[in-house]
Amino acid sequence: MLHVKRTLVTTALPYANGPVHLGHLAGVYLPADLYVRYKRLKGDNIIHIGGSDEHGVPITLTAEKEGISPRDVVDRYHGMNLDAFTKCGISFNYYGRTTSAVHHATAREFFSEIENKGMFTRKTEKQFFDKKANRFLSDRYITGTCPICSNPDANGDQCEQCGTHLSPLELINPKSKLSDATPELRETLHWYFPLGRFQSELESYVQSHDKEWRPNVINYTRTWLKQGLNDRAITRDLSWGIKLPLETPEASGKVLYVWFDAVLGYISFTKEWAAQSGQPELWREYWQDPECRMINFIGKDNVVFHTLMFPAILMAWNKGRKTDLYNLADNVPASEFMNFEGRKFSKSRNYAVYLGDFLEKFPADTLRYCIAMNYPENKDSDFSWLDFQNRTNGELADTLGNFIKRSIDFTNSRFDGKVPCECTPEEWKIPGIDWKETLEKLDQAFEAFHFREATSLGMDIARTANRFLTESEPWKVIKSDREGAAKTMAISLNLCYALALVLYPVIPETANRILAMLGVEKSIDDQLDSGKSCIAQILTPQLEKGHQLRKHSEILFTKIEDAELAPELKKIEDLLALTEEREAKNEAKAMDFSPLISFDEFLKVDLRVATVLDCQKIKKAGKLLKLQLKVGSETRQVLAGIAKHYSPEEMIGKNVILVANLAERTILNEISQGMILAVEGTDGKLFLVEPSGKEINGKKIQ
């Protein structure tokens, strides 16, 4: 088993511009809580730090849309999300806010340290400016047509339809979201962080963890490293945010870019936790003691911010220092996405189940269990209402809950509510469970972040316990062999205790209720003590002969009836109907043919057969492929938004149709010398137009 002096767990900061949904819970906050609760159960010294990201354009956009101040927005959603997390049993030691004075001071301190070392560069660049609103426009304040998929509603930073990361300058027909006016380009000065300067150090850092980190984290990070790291802007022209600690005209109106600001929240929140604990310097033991292990729980869309950018900021601080050096993360267990009824969660389309809404209707532990059993560890998973119902009814109610209630009720009715006899170490083996091996497997699963495996292990014990009680038939045996029935019940009651411990990280409120029904004075929460392992109690029976149970049991899990799910299924039906209606409109709109052109105009379009020689994915563009095409005697580079439909490997050797005389464009610093043709099906899938025949490469389409 792994032992360290102390462990710091951080969780990605959710934007305080809306409520968190089940996708957020599954990807970041529940896995972190499962890990933290297990480590506490082992007696490890561990703290869990989280908080709200309260700066950035999403906040100001929401404020302007609602006609309120950014402060009103973040106050509302910080409180709402913290309340939802608390009700769900997410056990933060501290949940902070990036608008706090401590955080502002910490972020400015980091900026000043790096600025004083002369590491930042200043660059004048062109940025869109809205004359009507009299302000520079950051990327999310601009909308326009995507140059990749022609989506007319692409944002200045990304097209949601094709997933391509964009810059505002790449949009076709850009418009300001503030005034709907066409913005003009003006020069503005920004500070840049020299990410490329730390390329070698970051490569060594990632290499040192390649056996421990998940493959998706390693692969995505190495893709960025392979393509070379560039300077990244750390300032924006905004009024809401952390102002630069510089008294110069150039710094006026500038705030820290949220990617630089937010990750430093982990440090400032730990400082606030230490101060709240009455030991203001205690935070250093978690950030500046090499014997502390740090784990950053994130979703897969935040990988490079935590494997490259945050470490680089800490490296910049550490450069040239002999004291107050910061630790880098030991692991960054990024989850894949959890979808909802087969589709991606989307706040913009309101296709989501919000955590607060869910907890008004169903118990938190049922949700925690269902998500843990569907944890998106190495691939995307799915939350469905029917699966939630089946797991609640079949596994939690019929298996676990049924066993606990039967054991306690029978003991209360036939043995005066007392453990009827001792359960010896030899008898503890009777159900067929190797407790030493179970403890080792449980530890290995949790320490490796295999939460589905750890949860399944607990439910397997519940199934074994249920089967043991059913096959032992104490209600029959007691008629002729009271001692034999007593032995069965002593074992069963101790199994109840062990199940509470094993499943505590997943269903903590239920685990404490089980111990209360068993008449145990201290809840598991009250037994947790740094340096003392509670989970090791499963190795031996804990309930002695004569121990008094609580007189009345309770139903741990109420089964979910079809009628309770009907409103939720109706919501999905309505949302899907709206989606189909929108898609139908788009399809109908697509049948409106373009304006007529003359034959001579058509002849101006030079369509050629090209063959794919090489194909690679583009960094920061989830749906973009870079193709090297052979067109007769020439070689062309073309970017195509088909990565979700064709892999690079299957593209090589294909014949495609190239618009050969299309003016070249620069997209994400890559040249695209033309366009290849594809057809979009009704389900959004793209199909390449693939000509076949011998010796047709370079030939013109007629």
UniProtKB/Swiss-Prot annotation:
Catalytic activity: tRNA(Met) + L-methionine + ATP = L-methionyl-tRNA(Met) + AMP + diphosphate
Binding site for ATP: 347
Record EC number: 6.1.1.10
CC terms in the record's Gene Ontology section: cytosol
Disulfide bonds: none
Co-factor binding comment: Binds 1 zinc ion per subunit.
Pfam families the record matches: Anticodon_3, tRNA-synt_1g, tRNA_bind
Family from the record: Belongs to the class-I aminoacyl-tRNA synthetase family. MetG type 1 subfamily.
Protein name: Methionine--tRNA ligase
Organism (species): Chlorobium phaeobacteroides (strain DSM 266 / SMG 266 / 2430)
Organism classification: Bacteria, Pseudomonadati, Chlorobiota, Chlorobiia, Chlorobiales
Gene designation per UniProt: metG
